[in-house]
């Protein structure tokens, strides 16, 4: 073989080896680019949910830029298709992961515990809300107990007083006091004038028994005996200052019987007005006398005086 033939053979082998090394380098570059693109796609898809088509276009552009020569399109095309498949599968996996994360977050948001926490957020309190509302259940239970005891007492033939509800309301009572100290002027007046009993009206506030009932004389018109204008009754027991939740209605009535006798109460034979006592008059008179006695003190008669 001549030297020229040897040079041609060597040149041909160099070209073949040069093309092979270029193809290997291009394949390695394409593989690295695909890996980088897949990583970028996972980040982008997790944040923005981009489409796999964009990744395929990027892979194709990178492959086209990395190849040259006549043999490059065929080999590069194979790599590009493979890279596109890899990018597509990676992107779809990232999209699925993003969907799963969003679904998990939505599930947490829509969970019963989350909804309950959202529904039961505490509203800002106001000064009005800080004031405790009266418990009507306590008042009702206490009055039912008191009323049953009254019915038991008035079932006796010699009952000192009787009780009936006003308009079937448990919170308003009419009490008829039948028995007064027989040696008192008031008892003699009742016998002479044919008055069978002293009619009292009691109304119980919302916060009873922690506040006293309001009691007034309805009839007859009584002078002195700590009975004021409008039938108001001057008794410290009926004021918030003198009241205790342990007091019973029976004790209040018996205290009145003692007070009216101690105060020399008499039935008015010629009353100043023929009109009946009204609740409004009694309330106004009671407020006035409470102010007076808070300034000068109270005098409470003993129960034995009645």
From Swiss-Prot:
Entry's Gene Ontology cellular component terms: nucleus
Domain UBC core: 138-299
Region of interest: Disordered: 18-77
EC numbers on record: 2.3.2.23
Active site: 234 (glycyl thioester intermediate)
GO MF entries: ATP binding; ubiquitin conjugating enzyme activity
Protein purpose: Catalyzes the covalent attachment of ubiquitin to other proteins.
Protein name (record): Ubiquitin-conjugating enzyme E2Q-like protein CG4502
Originating species: Drosophila melanogaster (Fruit fly)
